[in-house]
């Protein structure tokens, strides 16, 4: 290592330490400008103190940046050390940072809580040394506010209504609140940054619009509240809601019971009618057949039958399967004449 370069770095470190000690004990008169940034975003810190550094190759420029968590901190963290005569790359660079040699600036990648603090910069240009500091403050961005009615009081005598509104956010650091009406008039004093607003309205001014603005040093978001949805005239209806509930709930139970009971009776009647329906019987047909005797018979038998009809009637019952179509109401009788052959 070059002895001259090593000596220069030692001198620069000594001056930087002396500056930090002087600043920490309050002996310095240097004021650190404050840089406000959003948490999680990248931030560029210029390492020049309001004048352009001559980066000629004939001149030597050395930069040392350290970071302290508090003004009186005795142990500072080394962030970057850079020697222009050795090239465009720094000798040391802490993780989470990016050094830009063209404009001599330091980029903080994705601001984190541990990135917040005092950045002390020492710049050596030939025989002159500059020392200055920058304070970085990080704030979480404010989320959209929510407005709720905490309390509502109805004055029946004079028809006025008193409301207590609350404006809150879920995210955000050092959040302050301000209230205004539709015309933009601030309803609270500048010193009062409360998230609560107490208003009293008459019947003629119940349809109003109010704005709540939640803000911090890096963000500001407003939310509009329409009072017509929370009008005081709805107080009477809200008071009558308990007895309406006590009346409507039993009535609904009775109606449901009647509907279920009616459905059960109808189902039973339908099942009974299907059960009592007579089955389809097979249709019976009766066939009458006559058998006639011919030829000589024994005399005795012939004499016994002379007074009778020479034909003998035979009854035969025939069964026919029932058709699938509509059954006929009356049976059909078929008569057939059968003649016996001569013996």
Curated annotation (Swiss-Prot):
Q: Which cysteines are joined by disulfide bonds?
A: 161-232, 167-212
| Origin: domain of life | Eukaryota
Q: Which UniProt keywords apply?
A: Adaptive immunity, Cell adhesion, Cell membrane, Disulfide bond, Glycoprotein, Immunity, Immunoglobulin domain, Innate immunity, Membrane, Phagocytosis, Phosphoprotein, Receptor, Repeat, Signal, Transmembrane, Transmembrane helix
**Which residues belong to any copy of the Ig-like C2-type domain?**
145-228
Tell me what the record says results from residue 315 to A.
Abolishes SLAMF1:SH2D1A-mediated intracellular tyrosine phosphorylation, no effect on interaction with SH2D1A
Annotated GO MF terms: identical protein binding; SH2 domain binding; signaling receptor activity; virus receptor activity
- Biased segments, Polar residues type: 327-343
Q: Does the keyword Signal apply?
A: yes
Q: Which residues form the Ig-like V-type domain?
A: 29-138
- Tell me the membrane topology, using the record's own terms: Single-pass type I membrane protein
Residues forming the motif ITSM 2 are 333-338
Query: Where, subcellularly, is it found?
Result: Cell membrane
Which residues are tagged as glycosylated in the record?
54, 58, 103, 126, 151, 158, 192, 211, 226
Motif ITSM 1, per the record, lies over: 286-291
The motif SH2-binding: which residues? 313-318
Physiological role? Self-ligand receptor of the signaling lymphocytic activation molecule (SLAM) family. SLAM receptors triggered by homo- or heterotypic cell-cell interactions are modulating the activation and differentiation of a wide variety of immune cells and thus are involved in the regulation and interconnection of both innate and adaptive immune response. Activities are controlled by presence or absence of small cytoplasmic adapter proteins, SH2D1A/SAP and/or SH2D1B/EAT-2. SLAMF1-induced signal-transduction events in T-lymphocytes are different from those in B-cells.
> What is its quaternary makeup?
Interacts (via cytoplasmic domain) with SH2D1A and SH2D1B; SH2D1A mediates association with FYN; SH2D1A binds to phosphorylated and not phosphorylated ITSM 1. Interacts (via cytoplasmic domain phosphorylated on tyrosine residues) with INPP5D and PTPN11; presence of SH2D1A facilitates binding to INPP5D. Interacts with MAP4K1. Interacts with PIK3C3, BECN1 and UVRAG; indicative for an association with PI3K complex II (PI3KC3-C2).
Quote the record's domain comment.
The ITSMs (immunoreceptor tyrosine-based switch motifs) with the consensus sequence T-X-Y-X-X-[VI] present in SLAM family receptors have overlapping specificity for activating and inhibitory SH2 domain-containing binding partners. Especially they mediate the interaction with the SH2 domain of SH2D1A and SH2D1B. For SLAMF1 a 'two-out-of-three-pronged' mechanism is proposed involving threonine (position -2), phosphorylated tyrosine (position 0) and valine/isoleucine (position +3).
**Name of this protein:** Signaling lymphocytic activation molecule
């Amino acid at each position: 290592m070059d002895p001259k370069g090593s000596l220069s770095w030692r001198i620069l470190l000594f001056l930087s330490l002396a500056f930090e000690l002087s600043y920490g004990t309050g002996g310095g008169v240097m004021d650190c400008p404050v840089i406000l940034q959003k948490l999680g975003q990248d931030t560029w810190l210029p390492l020049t103190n309001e004048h352009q550094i001559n980066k000629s190759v004939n001149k030597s420029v050395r930069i040392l940046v350290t970071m302290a968590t508090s003004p009186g901190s005795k142990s500072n963290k080394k962030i970057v050390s850079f020697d222009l005569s050795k090239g465009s790359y720094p000798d040391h660079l802490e993780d989470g940072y990016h050094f830009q040699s063209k404009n001599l600036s330091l980029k903080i990648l994705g601001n984190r809580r541990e990135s917040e603090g005092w950045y002390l910069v020492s710049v050596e240009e030939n025989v002159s040394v500059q020392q200055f500091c920058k304070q970085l403050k990080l704030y979480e961005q404010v989320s959209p506010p929510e407005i709720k009615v905490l309390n509502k009081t109805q004055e029946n005598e004079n028809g006025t209504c008193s409301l207590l509104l609350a404006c809150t956010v879920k995210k955000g650091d050092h959040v302050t609140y301000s209230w205004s009406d539709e015309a933009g008039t601030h309803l609270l004093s500048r010193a009062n940054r409360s998230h609560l607003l107490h208003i009293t309205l008459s019947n003629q001014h119940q349809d109003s619009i109010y704005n709540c603005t939640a803000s911090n040093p890096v963000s500001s978001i407003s939310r509009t509240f329409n009072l017509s949805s929370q009008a005081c005239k709805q107080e009477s209806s809200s008071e009558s809601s308990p007895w309406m509930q006590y009346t409507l709930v039993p009535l609904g139970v009775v109606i449901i019971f009647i509907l279920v009971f009616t459905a059960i009776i109808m189902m039973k009647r339908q099942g009974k009618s299907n059960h009592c329906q007579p089955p389809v019987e097979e249709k019976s047909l009766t066939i009458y057949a006559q058998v006639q005797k011919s030829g000589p018979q024994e005399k005795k038998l012939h004499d016994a039958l002379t007074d009778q009809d020479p034909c003998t009637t035979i009854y035969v019952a025939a069964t026919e399967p029932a058709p699938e179509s509509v059954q006929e109401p009356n049976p059909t009788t078929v008569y057939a004449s059968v003649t016996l052959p001569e013996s």
